Amino acid sequence: MAKKPVMLAILDGLGLSDHKDGNAFSLAKKPNLDKIFKEYPHTVLGASGLSVGLPDGQMGNSEVGHLNIGAGRIVYQALTRITKSIEDGDIFKNEALLKAIDNAKNNDSAIHFMGLLSDGGVHSHIDHLKGLIDFAAKSGVKKVYVHAFLDGRDTAPKSALTYIEDLEKHMAEVGVGSIATVSGRYYAMDRDKRWERIELAYNAMVLGKGEVATSPKEAVERSYHDNKTDEFVLPTVIEKDGKPVATIKSNDSVVFFNFRPDRARQITRAINDKEFDGFKRETLNLVFVTMTEYDSTIEGVEVAFKPESYVNTLGEYVSKQGKKQLRIAETEKYAHVTFFFNGGVEEPNQNEDRALIPSPKVATYDLKPEMSAYEVTDEVLKRIDSDEYDMIILNYANPDMVGHTGVIDAAVKAVETVDECLGKVMDKILEKNGALFITADHGNCEQMIDYSTGNPMTAHTTNLVPFAYIANDAKEKELREEGILADIAPTMLQSMGLEVPKEMTGKSLFK
């Protein structure tokens, strides 16, 4: 018997804003989305700050958004957990961090803090780094070094010097710490197996090889002079008296203070995995601490804040009911519809199929704003036609990934591409008498100009995101206001005729 699939299409990075300037969503020709918002029940959802377990006013992101949607409850984020631990002083009792501190003291060796120097709060937070430096100083560690990855994506494109000055001031106040290397996140935080990028960052941190500067400021200013913003600063070794300030050596301790896993895995593997073959590198004997668990298969690392587990996520619960589901996305967002959507669990649920469509190999996605949306659409249409699936979770990466480039014309094209694809998906779901829910995980492409400066804005926003219900019975349904991302899973379960498990604290959006 043909199934009536219930599908969730996540339009990544598509928020709502009344501002027309720099708003790729409102500038785009989008007949299908216009029709949806005119003819079908729709509402708006909170996707940032307290609504998703982040500090008040903190912009949402893809990881957090998918965790909350999949869990059907507010998931308190690593950012909030770590900040609280520092404020409460609990961090001084953290076993993994104590191991790193003790190793440096016992061997009279160095402790290196590596990570994204930013207050973006997506991958890291500068306040966590300051807390770690305070911990090292109070513990009597003298050799304290920072390997700073520069942001410019979750912060303004040319804001690195502000964070460098802030950090250097803090280190001067506590009396320990120097910046040893700087590297744009494009290199140090690649997640697409572009090992040549990771290698440049590795060479700077471990071998002391690469671009050279006498100060972090010099490295950044030189990069700006070459028209490279923070994200693209070439990995640079900071030298003093003609020698590197510090390199990572055997018997040192390393703390990687990024809390978001996806862009932290590759460089962690490059330093730690015995079987690593991405490029030639040293074998080091280190105490290496990751702030959170980046991947349970990474060898030889200590985890400071171990994952919390979530029972009865949407995928797990639907699986327990004997239903079959599909997760589909292109490479850039595949981890989000699988690992993050399942509450940080790598293993698929029973009867959970996955379709990974490769993202195009381009330097930046403004060069191909369509990304792989057409290929994702072709595949999902085939899968819907197979009549196998009760639930389908799909992600279109374009509004977010192209939004991050700051190139507004490309972002408009990205929205138009997704709109075209959505039209085909909508027609197919209605033909099958199924239900299609449309939402986003956070905002981005709807504000691509910093209204205070007029400069391009490449970061996410705190704007509300859309939520719409498309089905043949949609005219009989109404959606309530003041919802959050955690309310989506209970809504979908109601649409599937399933009870909501007690672990889900989200509430259905149907009135």
Curated annotation (Swiss-Prot):
Catalysed reactions, semicolon-separated: (2R)-2-phosphoglycerate = (2R)-3-phosphoglycerate
GO MF: manganese ion binding; phosphoglycerate mutase activity
Extent of the signal sequence: none
Keywords, in A-Z order: Glycolysis, Isomerase, Manganese, Metal-binding
Membrane spanning stretches: none
Record-annotated active site: 62 (phosphoserine intermediate)
Protein EC: 5.4.2.12
A Pfam family annotated for this UniProt entry: Metalloenzyme
Residues where substrate binds: 123, 153-154, 185, 191, 260-263, 333
Listed CDD domains: iPGM (cd16010)
GO biological process, alphabetically ordered: glucose catabolic process; glycolytic process
Disulfide partners: none
Bound cofactor: record note: Binds 2 manganese ions per subunit.
Residue numbers binding Mn(2+) 1: 400, 404, 460
SUPFAM superfamilies linked to this entry: 2,3-Bisphosphoglycerate-independent phosphoglycerate mutase, substrate-binding domain, Alkaline phosphatase-like
Function: Catalyzes the interconversion of 2-phosphoglycerate and 3-phosphoglycerate.
Family to which the UniProt record says this protein belongs: Belongs to the BPG-independent phosphoglycerate mutase family.
Description of how the protein assembles with itself and partners: Monomer.
Name this polypeptide is given: 2,3-bisphosphoglycerate-independent phosphoglycerate mutase
Lineage start: Bacteria, Bacillati, Bacillota, Clostridia, Eubacteriales
